[in-house]
Amino acid sequence: MQRTVNIQAVESKLKFTFSQPRLLVTALTHPSYRNEFPSDGEDSERLEFLGDAVLGLVVTEHLFLLFPSLNEGLLSTTRSALVNAEACFNYTQKLSLGEHLLIGRGEKMQSHRGKISAYANLFEAILGAVYLDGGLAPARQIIVPLLPNKEAILPLMLVNPKNRLQQFTQQTLKVLPTYIALPWSSEDGTPGYHVQVFVNEKLWGEGFAGSKKEAEKLAAKQALSTHDDNKN
């Protein structure tokens, strides 16, 4: 059975009124819902693509202005922590937008991972819709209040071993670590990555994992464990 969208309720949560409400309906339409009701307009995928870029720009600008002396590497990794799927899921939860998602009956949302993905995509799609309807300013007004304050962002930078290693090598050696990723397979044949981290062309650590990002974290963690006396 097709569901209707309470446009005013969503607009109230966003504190933004659409001049083109159809954009909001599209943003709320998960691809699985459109598969069940193909005559019911577009799904949210294209708006997700646009919203991802809008979110990245606003967060980049916010960090750039908030931390005028922070280098590009730390700005980049901090931005990643504020725009990843987990972060977007949390933004959706803060605004209580998930209840408005139009999703197909057969779509798996029982798992936490499935819910994170669906809600993260929803947030990006809504940002894309807001941007098309009103431009960057209203999108910024939605995003910035959801971001952690400066004091909360500072420790966030050091939670990731890559950030801690970068800070350590910059402070002590005035250089940045370099990561090299190689294909790797686990004992059961699952593909993944073997990442090596070098500092001044010397191998400092290695990591093995299914994703390159996780392998980089493990390599950085090993490098810290053998080179940073203050790691604890």
From Swiss-Prot:
Record GO terms (molecular function): double-stranded RNA binding; metal ion binding; ribonuclease III activity; rRNA binding
SMART domains xrefs: DSRM, RIBOc
GO biological process: mRNA processing; regulation of gene expression; rRNA processing; tRNA processing
Positions of the DRBM domain: 160-229
Binding of Mg(2+), residues: 48, 121, 124
RNase III domain segment(s): 7-135
Cell compartments where the protein resides: Cytoplasm
EC number: 3.1.26.3
Major enzyme class: hydrolase
Gene Ontology CC terms, in alphabetical order: cytoplasm
Main location group: cytoplasm
Active site: 52, 124
Designated name of the protein: Ribonuclease 3
Natural source organism: Chlamydia muridarum (strain MoPn / Nigg)
Gene: rnc
